[in-house]
Amino acid sequence: MRTGLIAKKLGMTRLFKEDGTHVPVTVLHLDNVEVVDARTNERDGYTAIQLGLGNAKVKNVTKANRGHFARTKVEPKRHLAEFRVSEDALLEAGTKLSAAHFVVGQKVDVTGQSKGKGFAGVMKRHNFAGLEASHGVSISHRSHGSTGQRQDPGKVFKGKKMAGHMGDERVTTLNLEIAAVDEERNLIMVRGAIPGAKNGLVLIRDAIKKARHADAPYPAATVAAAG
């Protein structure tokens, strides 16, 4: 199992194929993605890689993280993310990763923070049908109906679908296809939409329900190797 990548969502566009058909894609930017630290079985009890995205000013970094970056001798990063990997896929701190880490046609899983929708009713939030339009129903047309039972059990069960805050939660979309890769500009174009707003952070991994692409570099595609 190899590492994923942390990227910034730039927005959506479309790519034209040779036959004239077009494909909607989401453009992701790898802003100086670098290995910050590695977790080992001897020290941490598991194996993983910590990646950093975008450079940060030292004054904006917490004192604890300053020490962390100083220990690994890596320039301070604006965002951090950790990926579980196999022991043979560990990378040294300071290794810069390239967009060539993923190849065209490969299936990936993309995780992001969905857009917040505010307080929403059950018809929008849970796709409820609502109550009757007439036949004695007034004012309550978009309500959820019964909340529970009666004196027994005398409570509302946890997880009951009701009105409440919608969106702004961690969402993973599975089996998206890599439509194009631009190594020079460090761009990855994923077919279709992915969770989150523009400039939001996303995590890209090899699809967990699909076999890894035969041409995908292992353990990773570094900037030096890609160049």
UniProtKB/Swiss-Prot annotation:
Signal peptide: none annotated. InterPro entries: Ribosomal_uL3, Ribosomal_uL3_bac/org-type, Ribosomal_uL3_CS, Transl_B-barrel_sf. Methylated by PrmB. The modification N5-methylglutamine is found at Q151. GO terms for biological process: translation. One of its GO terms (cellular component) is cytosolic large ribosomal subunit. It comes from the Bacteria. Belongs to the universal ribosomal protein uL3 family. Part of the 50S ribosomal subunit. Forms a cluster with proteins L14 and L19. NCBIfam families: L3_bact (TIGR03625). This is Large ribosomal subunit protein uL3.
